[in-house]
């Protein structure tokens, strides 16, 4: 469950290391986001020479969440950390690599490029 002021690890090589959620997109009074939801975030820490800089406002998709996500077969999937991938407006990632596992639910929301770059899809 990601809400405003939540800090997330960045799971790609776009240059950002940590982002803070400003808004969960999809509805005027939406409070929480989970895996596969798009958020607007501010870059809180970044590596020097990266594509994105500290203080930039970016869009990102949540790829890992500590809060469990219930699947249709009744099983749950949860991760050890909250993580996101910074995306462009066309749903493609800004970076060229994805680090760590991502959930299969991203396929339903048409983030196919992220799934193809990920080392493991759970």
Curated annotation (Swiss-Prot):
Disulfide linkage:
none
Q: Which residues belong to the signal peptide in this entry? A: none
This protein's UniProt keywords: Ribonucleoprotein, Ribosomal protein, RNA-binding, rRNA-binding
Q: Which CDD domains match?
A: Ribosomal_uL14
GO annotations of cellular component type = cytosolic large ribosomal subunit
Any one GO molecular function term: large ribosomal subunit rRNA binding
- Report any one BP term from Gene Ontology: translation
Q: Which domain of life is it from?
A: Bacteria
Pfam families xrefs = Ribosomal_L14
Assembly and oligomerization: Part of the 50S ribosomal subunit. Forms a cluster with proteins L3 and L19. In the 70S ribosome, L14 and L19 interact and together make contacts with the 16S rRNA in bridges B5 and B8.
NCBIfam families this protein is in?
rplN_bact
- Family note: Belongs to the universal ribosomal protein uL14 family.
Q: What does this protein do?
A: Binds to 23S rRNA. Forms part of two intersubunit bridges in the 70S ribosome.
Report the protein name in the record: Large ribosomal subunit protein uL14
């Amino acid at each position: 469950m990601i809400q405003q002021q939540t800090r997330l690890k960045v799971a790609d090589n776009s240059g950002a290391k940590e982002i803070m959620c400003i808004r969960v997109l999809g509805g005027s009074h939406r409070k929480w986001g989970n895996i596969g939801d798009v958020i607007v975030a501010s870059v809180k820490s970044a590596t020097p020479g990266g594509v994105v800089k500290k203080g930039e406002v970016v869009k990102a998709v949540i790829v890992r969440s500590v809060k469990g996500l219930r699947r249709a077969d009744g099983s749950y999937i949860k991760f050890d950390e909250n993580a996101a991938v910074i995306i462009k407006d066309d749903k493609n990632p800004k970076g060229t690599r994805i680090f760590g596992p991502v959930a299969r639910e991203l396929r339903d929301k048409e983030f196919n490029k992220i799934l193809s770059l990920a080392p493991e899809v759970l």
